[in-house]
Amino acid sequence: AFNITFTDLAGNSGAAVNSLTGGDDAVRIDKTIPTITTASIASNNGSGDELAVPGNIITLTIVANEDIVEPTVSIATQSATVSVGADAQNWTATYTMTENENNGTIPFSITFSDSAGNDGVAQTALVNDADGNNVNYDKSQPVLSNVTLTSDNTFNNAYAKSGSVVTLAFDSNEQLLTSSVVISINGVSRTPSKALSWNGVKESWVATYTMTNATDDNGGAGISVPFTVDYVDLNGYAGDQVDATSSGVGVTFDKTAPSITTLSYLSNNSNSTNMAKVGDVITVSIEASEDLQTPDLSIAGNDVADEAAGGTNAIWTGSYAMQ
């Protein structure tokens, strides 16, 4: 409030003035420090607004107890974009997370003052947040290791036939969201199970598929059994799709029975290879349509040790000296 009395040089007194013409007092005294009544933080992460990964947008909702000038806001120690809401008491600040921020709870700071220039106490803690949770940031992308694809084939677990059970196994360096572990084996969706729960270092997963005659084996030449693994960690960070084993060795599917394409049964008899006497050596040689396990061979009712020949497991030979 103010009051003005005045007199001109001749001694004439003017009417006292104590208000502005057509308005209120020009100066309003404000010595009250403003406060933040709401400081609420959330992420647009699909797995939960208290989680964040690179690319997520963090939103800080700010409400003051009186009009304030545009506040200065940092989120994750970075300058945030600030916009006014319905009035100068309501503000919003946003920041998009990058690979440069540190893992852990996302910090924030609000520096503000009211219209009179009274500085408020910088706000760094939640106030009236709906769930009371800070946002946890995780920029560590999950990675799979020890990825194996094996068959229950007792001779060679790198091969499968119709009826063979193929098992996909792998470890993760982070806890995975079960509903987001998506596995396909031989083009068929499979439900994984956890073989080892999180132990602070890793967790292990497995999925199986039983091969059938419905799968083409490329005319007996065999085909590599395909698989894919898609996965997301608890913070909603997706790992790179995996479609190969760690060793590069997978499973070959072959449902076609082998056949003998060439067979020779000869004696070293000096008169005729079709004749044999005691002491003569009879040799059996076979060539199959594909690589074989060691075949069982007998000559004249006697088991004979045979061996692969020609640098391939498709050709085998065995000999027996007649007695």
Give the role of each language-model region.
Residues 1-9, 16-21, 73, 93-115, ...:
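Contiguous beta-strand segments of beta-sheet-rich domains
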Residues 1, 6, 27, 34, ...:
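Extracellular/surface recognition and adhesion modules
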Residues 83-90, 97-100, 196-205, 212-216, ...:
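Short proline/glycine- and polar residue-rich coil/turn motifs
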Residues 18-37, 124-146, 243-261, 266-268:
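Flexible, low-complexity linkers/stalks enriched in Thr/Pro that connect modular domains
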Residues 46-56, 154-164, 270-280:
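Short, solvent-exposed loop/linker segments at the N-terminal edge
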Residues 32, 39, 71, 94, ...:
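Tandem-repeat architecture and repeat-register "anchor" residues
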Residues 2, 58-83, 166-196, 282-308:
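Short, surface-exposed alpha-helix to beta-strand junction/turn motifs within ectodomains of secreted
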Residues 24, 31, 55-59, 70, ...:
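Surface-exposed or flexible loop/turn and strand-edge residues in extracellular/cell-surface modules
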